[in-house]
A protein has these predicted regions:
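Conserved PLP-enzyme active-site core in the AAT-like
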Residues: 2-269, 275-290, 298-306
Length: 308
């Protein structure tokens, strides 16, 4: 019997993985110092240092505002050195925003993954233009799992200055971790967190989950499973007439081109998924706890509605 509550609209639908839940339960025993001066935050910080093979790491939580976003042209969801130059060199007058930081998403919003050499090429371009490189790693774990690369190889060793390491989509309840690979960029960061209302008094309950996720490589195990389920779905629907894969499956998302009647029929059958990627486009996301049987049920329904 499969869990009928499992859906494919978002990897945020899933709950908390057992490793994270266990760490939070342990952190709930006794008293600890507040505002990040606790043993769990120290352990999490040290775990990040080990994982990324560096001593320059940050702490959980980040918030910023007031920035002007300039959207770059992409290829399969990925920014290129050429598209960065197009924006950075477009205008130099005071009436145009002055670019300061390039942000790339790993894995991207369409499920593609930047290779180390692609990140390095972007980093080299950023240095040439006097820009910093920030990586939005909401699904960073999935990228590592797909490529078989270490976190260091996909971040600072490839030229990333700051990484936002996501945990929410990989078994945590809340929380992202900010890792600074250039110590100078982290100066006064604690003050900015405080000013932005991001300094939790009981920080251990944001830090302990990271200990549970990082120790014994639970983060990698869960992201591998989510990726596997996405690959399985892709394989199961690959021979269905009329179904087209919109983007290569490299992380935990599958983007399919379906007929509009099929999209409506799937929705009528109770399946939840997003259709923001164009007419007939559908996104199906797999999670750390997605059941293979549920993937097969979805694939079977896609086959039925496409043949109707």
């Amino acid at each position: 019997m499969t869990d009928k509550s499992q859906q494919f609209a978002s990897d945020n639908y899933s709950g908390i993985c057992p490793e994270v839940w266990s760490a939070m339960e342990k952190a709930n025993h006794g008293h600890q110092r507040s505002y990040g001066d606790d043993e769990w935050t120290l352990r999490a910080s040290n775990d990040f240092r080990k994982l990324f093979e560096t001593d320059e790491c940050g702490a959980p939580e980040f918030f910023s505002n007031g920035s002007k976003l300039l959207i770059a042209r992409t290829e399969n969801g990925k920014i290129t050195p050429e598209s960065i130059r197009e924006i950075a060199l477009k205008r130099k007058d005071i009436h145009y925003p002055k670019p300061r930081v390039v942000t790339i998403t790993q894995a991207t919003e369409v499920g593609s993954v930047y290779r180390p050499e692609e990140i390095r090429a972007i980093s080299d371009t950023c240095k040439e233009l006097g820009l910093l490189l920030h990586m939005d790693g909401a699904r960073f774990s999935n990228a590592c799992a797909f490529l078989g690369c270490t976190p260091a190889e996909l971040s600072w060793k490839a030229g990333v200055d700051v990484l936002c390491f996501g945990g929410t989509k990989n078994g945590m309840a809340v929380g992202e971790a900010i890792l600074f690979f250039d110590h100078a960029l982290s100066v006064d960061f604690d003050y900015r967190c405080k000013q932005a209302g991001q300094l939790a008094s009981k920080m251990r309950f944001l830090s302990a989950p990271w200990v549970g996720l990082l120790e014994n490589d639970a983060w990698l195990k869960h992201s591998r499973h989510a990726n596997h389920c996405a690959q399985l779905l892709s394989q199961l629907v690959s021979d269905i007439p009329g179904v087209e894969l919109m983007f290569p499956v490299e992380a935990n998302g599958v983007f399919l081109q379906l007929s509009e009647p099929a999209v409506a029929a799937l929705t009528a059958r109770g399946w939840r998924f997003y259709t923001f990627i164009g007419k007939g486009g559908a996104r199906f996301m797999c999670s750390w706890d997605t059941e293979e049987a549920r993937v097969r049920e979805l694939a079977a329904d896609i086959r039925e509605v496409m043949s109707a």
